[in-house]
A protein has these predicted regions:
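Glycine-rich loop motifs involved in handling phospho/adenylate chemistry
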Residues: 54-59
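Sequence-level motif detector for i,i+2 pairs with an aromatic at +2
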Residues: 6-9, 60, 168
Length: 185
């Protein structure tokens, strides 16, 4: 965004969650899908937040839940402040509720966990451990996609440490609609 401020309105890093058993009180919640994301996630995707402040995603252990998940798990009770447990050891505090995503989205999830460490993503953040992240951009003008793609290689060269000069890295921006159609996920 610092390198392409006129083209990019918002950007968000997302990591799909896998492998954690999620509990509310002593009840194992089955078939729960979650993602890790940052504070810009909801603005990047244009997802309305019904309760809470998305800026609270900066706090480690924060989670925002879909309105469907909130209704299924808590009924009519207010979910704000309730605790979800991951693997019976990491506490996630519900800080907000967002409008359900459309069923045809590539990101199917019941809740969004703060990507910030304590209790969140514990993997590598360096050059050799962050290749599992998806980065999503909201462009100010969809026509700028070619301009963004033209600038990506320059940005890679600017920020890649010299020790990786012999690595071949190719990145490009594609419209989310096309990603949905070509993704193998």
């Amino acid at each position: 965004d610092r390198d392409m401020p006129e083209e990019i309105e918002f950007a968000s890093c997302v990591l799909t969650g896998q492998g954690m058993s999620i509990y509310y009180e002593d009840k194992l919640l089955s078939d729960v899908n979650y993602i890790y994301a940052d504070t810009c996630f909801f603005r990047t995707f244009g997802i309305p937040v019904l309760k809470g402040n998305p800026k609270d995603m900066i706090m480690p252990g924060s989670v925002f839940v879909s309105e469907h998940f909130a209704r299924e798990t808590f009924g009519d009770a207010d979910p704000i402040g309730k605790i979800l447990k991951a693997d019976r050891q990491n506490d996630f505090t519900i800080r907000g509720v967002y409008k359900d995503m459309p069923e045809n989205t590539v990101l199917t999830h019941d809740f969004v966990v703060s990507i910030h460490r304590d209790g969140g993503y514990q993997g590598g953040y360096g050059w050799k451990g962050n290749d599992v992240f998806y980065t999503f951009l909201r462009l100010r003008n969809a026509a700028d996609i070619d301009k963004v793609n033209d600038n990506i290689q320059r940005v890679i060269e600017k920020y890649t440490p010299a020790q990786y000069d012999d690595w071949k890295m190719n990145f490009s921006v594609i419209p989310l609609v096309k990603y949905h159609l070509i993704s193998s996920d």
